[in-house]
């Protein structure tokens, strides 16, 4: 089939739009804790995450600090009083943190990685959001190192024939 035939076949779709698949975005699928209901899809070749990481992390730390400072209750406060004041604050903080994390990774990370609990829950001596970011950014680092090595090998192969 020639190029024109292929283009005609593609343009005969119901909406008349020609679909082009460049295959430049390769999302990888990760299963969390062996749970088939917790599949995370990430484009671990997305270098723009470097631009998003620092501002997102600063916002998350600021939210955690603000929530902690507002959780200072007097020693004589009743459990009901603490819960009444803390619940909406913590819920609102968690929603903001989840939105930031999802934007950072350009995926539904918060729901898949932390379906219950909150992003500021303590986990292994750090906030849950910190643990999630550490684990996921390591996936990006490993993939990007691998991709850059492939590029280096390809460039080396092509330049070798001209230098020897």
PLM features per residue range, with description:
Residues 79-96:
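Intrinsically disordered, low-complexity acidic Ser/Thr-rich regulatory segments
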Residues 2-82:
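Short N-terminal mixed-charge amphipathic segments
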Residues 1-16, 150-164:
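Short acidic DE-rich linear segments
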Residues 99-164:
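C-terminal charged interaction modules
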Residues 47, 84-88, 123:
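Charge-dense, low-complexity intrinsically disordered segments
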Residues 71-72, 88, 146, 160:
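Short, flexible coil/linker elements and helix-boundary hinge sites characteristic
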Residues 19, 27, 96-102:
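Extended, low-complexity, charge-balanced
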